[in-house]
Amino acid sequence: MPDLLLELRSEEIPARMQRKAAGDLKKMLTDGLVEAGLTYEAAREYWTPRRLTLDIRGLTARSKDIREEIKGPSTTAPEQAVQGFLRKAGLSSVADAHVHSDPKKGDFYVAHISKPGRAAEEIIAQLVPGIIRNFPWPKSMRWGPASAKPGSLRWVRPLQSVLCTFGPETEEPVVVDFEIDGIRSGNITYGHRFLAPGEITVRRFDDYVSKLEAAKVVLDADRRKEIILADARNLAFANGLDLVEDEGLLEEVSGLVEWPVVLMGEFEEAFLAIPAEVIRLTIRANQKCFVTRPQGEGEALSNRFILTSNIEARDGGKEIAHGNGKVVRARLSDALYFWTTDQGDLPDLGQLEASAEKFGLDLNKPLDQRMARLDHLNVTFHAKLGTQGERVERIRRLAEELAPTVGADPVLAARAAVLAKADLQTEVVGEFPELQGAMGRKYALLQGEHPSVAAAIEEHYKPQGPSDYVPSDPVSVAVALADKLDTLVGFWAIDEKPTGSKDPYALRRAALGVVRILVEDRIQLRLSSIFASAGACYAGSGADQTRDLLAFFHDRLKVYLRDQGARHDLIDAVITPQSDDLLQIVRRVEALGSFLDTEDGKNLLAGTKRAANILAAEEKKKTAVAKTVEPALFKENAEKSLFAAVNQAEKQAGEAIQNEDFSAAMLALSALREPVDSFFEGVLVNDEDLEVRANRLALLTRIRAATGQVADFSKIAG
């Protein structure tokens, strides 16, 4: 079967757009081909900085002929209805239609439409120009004289050529001929812009790849990544160094070169006085280079970095490395200035005394000065939630309140909360916002803060995603919870909640962070009381907001537990709208899951569900159910045994739950298994004596109540 090769060659495409653009091209073209009646065996996309390529294998040469029947109105229908049918069917008159008869509906018009299949080349030639014109680039441009005309072509960078060939392996492929804004498709591409810029005539994908490789273009982005990583590791090792690997940077750099050549540059060792994170970010952000570290020396960096060139220079890349080194030195000079400036006094100390007094700050300490300035400048956190200074005060109060619960020193928790946002006013964080927290920790240690306070300044942002670590130091935990809970309660109070896929303030991430901290650090916390104290300063906070926010946490907990492998039905069975201790919910789910894995658990579940089903049916029929169980009405020993077992199990399970020993509660309930089985085997619930029936139904309600202390068994599958 024929194969299709398509290449769209342009000026350099931004690296961050390449992967998605290639995927979009594949989806748009394959969807269009299928919609047009073609099928294919496989499709794969490729990309380099200057081209998007699609290789589609086993594409059918022609779409199938289609015979379509369009049913029309009755032959006695009004003229207007008949004319509408003719327009829809593309017929000029009723003479072109057929008349069908139906015993019930009578005679009616039918149009038989035959659509002959189309050649794949024709379909491709029609599809590709439309895809190019409607391509979903985040940003695009117009160029050249034609750009002044309405409707002129837009592309991410000027489009230079389109290659499009089609045909089976056994025949010479043909060029699929079409034109888009003066660019006519062909079988010509071009090699590397500098190393092999000449024309290349292409037949099909295999020789396309090999000819590009000969012309210094590695088409496969994953292979470019492998080349860069392997060569960078080897170059570092040859110089007694280890490469500091960075997957995000590797992805970006592979999108900057068509022919990767790895080189090494260096800078003065004096710059190693700058924190490693700052050096790494400076070199990464500005020069797209990798840093290295001496072999076997921990986290300390070396003064050498690795860059990726797009050309093979005659001097072996010495001038390229030297030029990059000059730029890196200039950037590191700026970073060193930021680093030293942040450790000095601010010029406006005299204006910061009121803020310092408010927060108990020591203006002899650089980080305290930055916090005082953050408050003094009235930096807005959110228009409806006040300034950063007001937010810090809320976090401090909440951290102090949470400290005893999480085992933290309230004084240290308050101090950490006050300094947590101070580094937002530092020069380094102003240049590299992603270092907020990490730089605060370094500055805190430099000014002699308690290690737990310094750690909390960095870790209060944690966890920032499902793969990020959860803080364990009690002071960090107190401030992390306070920060996230203040944010959530505040945005709920002003009614700015996540909707659908929109979550501009990352509230889902904040809630998941609270869930992970409470569950993974095994912290018991009544969220409702924290919501009340955190929301006391908001006019819009109240019982409705508390219920809604608690439901939001339940949703996040369900997502988290399902990702951990928990059964969704067990989670639903345990959670109630009032459940505000997330760790307790998790413990209940764990205990319930273990219990239901046993034979006693499975049988009790079956018996409990049977009792619940009988009760539901009788309650629906409004059958009388006694309010209490009357032992005097028992006729069978199985009734007496079940009643005694329920009384004991209910009492023991209740005591175990009070002690939060959910495994013991399940053990107590397991004693119901045999009495419940015996009851259903030997007792007819719907006795003819209505009083006896009502009493037996009341006994079933006791089973439901006893098990309901742990979970709603009716929600459990099985």
UniProtKB/Swiss-Prot annotation:
Which enzyme class? ligase
Gene Ontology cellular-component terms for this entry are: cytosol
Keyword terms: Aminoacyl-tRNA synthetase, ATP-binding, Cytoplasm, Ligase, Nucleotide-binding, Protein biosynthesis
Q: Cross-referenced Pfam families, in alphabetical order? A: DALR_1, tRNA_synt_2f
- Compartments where found: Cytoplasm
EC assignment: 6.1.1.14
List GO molecular-function terms, semicolon-separated.
Answer: arginine-tRNA ligase activity; ATP binding; glycine-tRNA ligase activity
InterPro entries (UniProt xref): DALR_anticod-bd, Gly-tRNA-synth_bsu, Gly-tRNA-synth_heterodimer
- Gene Ontology biological process terms from the UniProt entry: arginyl-tRNA aminoacylation; glycyl-tRNA aminoacylation
What is this enzyme's catalytic activity, as reactions?
tRNA(Gly) + glycine + ATP = glycyl-tRNA(Gly) + AMP + diphosphate
Q: Which NCBIfam families match?
A: glyS
Oligomer and partners: Tetramer of two alpha and two beta subunits.
Q: What's the family?
A: Belongs to the class-II aminoacyl-tRNA synthetase family.
What's the protein name? Answer: Glycine--tRNA ligase beta subunit
Organism encoding this protein: Mesorhizobium japonicum (strain LMG 29417 / CECT 9101 / MAFF 303099) (Mesorhizobium loti (strain MAFF 303099))
What gene is behind this protein? glyS
